[in-house]
Amino acid sequence: MNYKDTLLMPKTDFPMRGGLPNKEPQIQEMWDNDDQYRKALEKNKNNPSFILHDGPPYANGNLHMGHALNKIIKDFIVRYKTMQGFYAPYVPGWDTHGLPIEQALTKKGVDRKKMSVAEFREKCKEFALKQIDIQKKDFKRLGVRGDFNNPYITLTPEYEAAQIRLFGEMADKGLIYKGKKPVYWSPSSESSLAEAEIEYHDKRSASIYVAFDVKDSKGKVDSDAQFIIWTTTPWTIPSNVAITVHPELKYGQYNVDGHKYIVAQALSEEVAEALGWDKDSIQLEKEFTGKELEFVEAQHPFLDRVSLVINGEHVTTDAGTGCVHTAPGHGEDDYIVGQKYDLPVISPLNDKGVFTEEGGPFEGMFYDKANKAVTDLLKEKDALLKLDFITHSYPHDWRTKKPVIFRATPQWFASINKVRQDILDAIEDTNFKVDWGKTRIYNMIRDRGEWVISRQRVWGVPLPVFYAENGDIIMTKETVNHVADLFEKHGSNIWFEKEAKELLPEGFSHPGSPNGEFTKETDIMDVWFDSGSSHRGVLETRPELSFPADLYFEGSDQYRGWFNSSITTAVATRGQAPYKFLLSHGFVMDGEGKKMSKSLGNVIVPDQVVKQKGADIARLWVSSTDYLSDVRISDEILKQTSDVYRKIRNTLRFMLGNINDFNPETDSIAETNLLEVDRYLLNRLREFTASTINNYENFDYLNIYQEVQNFINVELSNFYLDYGKDILYIEKKDSHKRRSMQTVLYQILVDMTKLLAPILVHTAEEVWSHTPHVKEESVHLSDMPKVVDVDEELLEKWNTFMNLRDDVNRALEQARNEKVIGKSLEAKVVIGSNESFNTAEFLQQFNDLQQLFIVSQVEVKDKVNDGVSYQYGDIHIKHAEGEKCERCWNYTEELGSVGELEHLCPRCQEVVKTLV
């Protein structure tokens, strides 16, 4: 007889190899055909909801790993919440307006000047929608489930109308105004920028010290003294109208070789060193506070203009001279302090950053090129004390990567000052996973200036503002709502297709327009106002969603972006934050923590990972990251992820193979009748389940990744599944011992598949389709396992046993190295108590020790004279006695010796007898 034919070997059609790149699209097609997203919602439609509001990615360009990280974690969250019984719709969105799309069309050869604004905008729209189709397909390929057939898009008429109405409510509250203020201005984009559109890079700049002669000392300083200022923007000197000093700082008039200079005393040594003064030749002649210097008049170094000495709290002693060059047309602090003194706002640059006629001798020069001309003129006037060059962190346009400037222009603003405290209070009411997230957005709101919301572009939502003949601004509830209604019906292109009069309510009149003529605003809204209105355009508009959302989750750059603009508009109009919980992730770097770039050749993109390895590998990688900070990816990291995946897959396959003849309805053993080792594993499963559920609740996916590996490697592979082979393969098919183990194995398989489902979406579905007797058609329509109390006493007992078993394994390994045994079934374990542990008494509680140790024989003694001492007993390993059973390979002294049952141990004889 071939005894192999009598073994109950694993059987399953579940393949060992994943073949994910080919298999995943088939599974996704099945989900689409079954409309699984709708089924998942329908299942929980009467339950409490959980709303994760999708921050809209920009509809331009292919997906990068940051997109994948973001969308995959969102999918973890929504799928988990759905399996926990929540009604959890997920509506993906796209941000579609703004300069990058205009630039993309220009690169494609679209000549904006050869068409009307409305025609150009139509091309922008077509481009954006094509980009959305590409990105949508790629997001779905990552296994992300959502309402992709009905996403929200910021260019749709209903969204734009909601945005206009929100704008109108802010205007009604006096939060929208027009003013000439210095704003971040990008000459390369020819537009103003919000703080969220600024990024900092190193830049080499001129560093100059300039002397301003005293013109009218007011009897406070010597008339032949000079104020020294320091600046890294020489091109702003033509706009200088003041010198700001701190009212409480002490200043000194210093005589240096007959020259009299005024600087802050706290900075005098640094100034002396910078200007190369001989310390022995410096004399402090006079002292005064900044307050005492107020209203002293200095002379502009090369213009016929007074530079007034004023007081400002923003002056520090971190660098410079303590006497701050002040040009209200080119700096926010300068502008604010200048307002108090009614100083003129001079900003002689055009949109391209080129000096206008107002710039005098610098007319026609690009501001950066004017630096040299200004310093040359200062030198000519003997006002330049020092010219140097420094490299410092400087604001750049996030799109063009070119430097920006502060430039005073007429702009539309949303007032932050009027709602700042309300926003800060709303942040206090918001939950955060990490304290630094709260600190970050709190400080940004606390410190940010007014929000410039106008842009001098065409591809965006028009500002719904009209002007009367006399220049009066028309922005009433009636006119704004009428524009919103028009946008909702026709889309915002109507603004560029119709005259102002046609966009106003029928019969509208205004005292400032006696002839009934009106003009319309040409600026559009900041794209952050677009996406920052999504709580109105989506949460409050879509019937399946609600305000506020339970969660906003985006990259950490959104503390100054979408998180910021959203809470600003929500607090301004609804008096509360649009999110209950705020969570963020870091950026994706290469394997060495460097930024990915084509030039370095270290770029990995989602499409490449999916085609080569599969979306589940990308998803498992995401779960393996500490996403709260920057994460790393490389071919080597993905190889490690693939190895972990293979281990998970093979473990699930092993369990599938060993329950092929098990029906939980008829073959299950009641928990009280399970073997104790099986009850131990059931309780370990419950511990693992409780921990995994807790980790999902706390968005701790790295913990899940690590604990899954630990459970599979330590509990299953290294013990239970290895131990179980002697039972599952060898025992009689329906023996109590075998059915006891299959009962627990089935539970482990089902629960693990559910717990892994939000992460390994395709593999879990594949396992589910091969699992016999499951009720739900899809694992994603099943519920998460319930958290059940564990038997602590049982776990404590078996945890001690597992530690003891580790000692036995160490002894077996030693015996293997010494050639006493080969495989562990060749061993007899002799074990006894020692001073550190009463092994003999402890092991009296356990049966079938030879199976638990995976050896042929175990002898427990009070004392082992020739054993090696371990923490949990003295252990001696011998070669097993007797001969090897040809069926189970255990050694015994009771081998059969007759006919069919020859060379079989008594246990195998009993099993085979039933088969003959």
Swiss-Prot record:
A single Gene Ontology biological process assigned to it is: isoleucyl-tRNA aminoacylation
What start-end ranges are recorded for coiled-coil regions in this protein? none
Task: Give cofactor(s), names only.
Answer: Zn(2+)
Q: Which Gene3D superfamilies match?
A: 1.10.730.20, HUPs, Ile-tRNA synthetase CP2 domain-like
| Xref: InterPro entries | aa-tRNA-synth_I_CS (IPR001412), aa-tRNA-synth_Ia (IPR002300), Anticodon_Ile_BEm (IPR033708), Ile-tRNA-ligase (IPR002301), Ile-tRNA-ligase_type1 (IPR023585), Ile-tRNA_ligase (IPR050081), M/V/L/I-tRNA-synth_anticd-bd (IPR013155), Rossmann-like_a/b/a_fold (IPR014729)
Q: What is known of its domains?
A: IleRS has two distinct active sites: one for aminoacylation and one for editing. The misactivated valine is translocated from the active site to the editing site, which sterically excludes the correctly activated isoleucine. The single editing site contains two valyl binding pockets, one specific for each substrate (Val-AMP or Val-tRNA(Ile)).
Entry binding sites for ATP:
598
Enzyme type, top EC level: ligase
- A GO cellular-component term linked to this record: cytosol
Q: What is its main location?
A: cytoplasm
Q: What Enzyme Commission number(s) does the record list for this chain?
A: 6.1.1.5
Cystine pairings recorded for this chain: none
Cofactor binding annotation: Binds 1 zinc ion per subunit.
Q: Which GO terms describe its molecular function?
A: aminoacyl-tRNA deacylase activity; ATP binding; isoleucine-tRNA ligase activity; tRNA binding; zinc ion binding
So what does this thing catalyse?
tRNA(Ile) + L-isoleucine + ATP = L-isoleucyl-tRNA(Ile) + AMP + diphosphate
Renumbered ranges of motif 'HIGH' region? 57-67
In UniProt terms, what function does this protein have? Catalyzes the attachment of isoleucine to tRNA(Ile). As IleRS can inadvertently accommodate and process structurally similar amino acids such as valine, to avoid such errors it has two additional distinct tRNA(Ile)-dependent editing activities. One activity is designated as 'pretransfer' editing and involves the hydrolysis of activated Val-AMP. The other activity is designated 'posttransfer' editing and involves deacylation of mischarged Val-tRNA(Ile).
Q: Where in the cell is it found?
A: Cytoplasm
Name this polypeptide is given? Isoleucine--tRNA ligase
- Family, similarity comment: Belongs to the class-I aminoacyl-tRNA synthetase family. IleS type 1 subfamily.
**UniProt: Zn(2+) binding residues:** 885, 888, 905, 908
Q: Which gene holds the coding sequence for this protein?
A: ileS
What's in the keyword line of the UniProt record?
A: Aminoacyl-tRNA synthetase, ATP-binding, Cytoplasm, Ligase, Metal-binding, Nucleotide-binding, Protein biosynthesis, Zinc
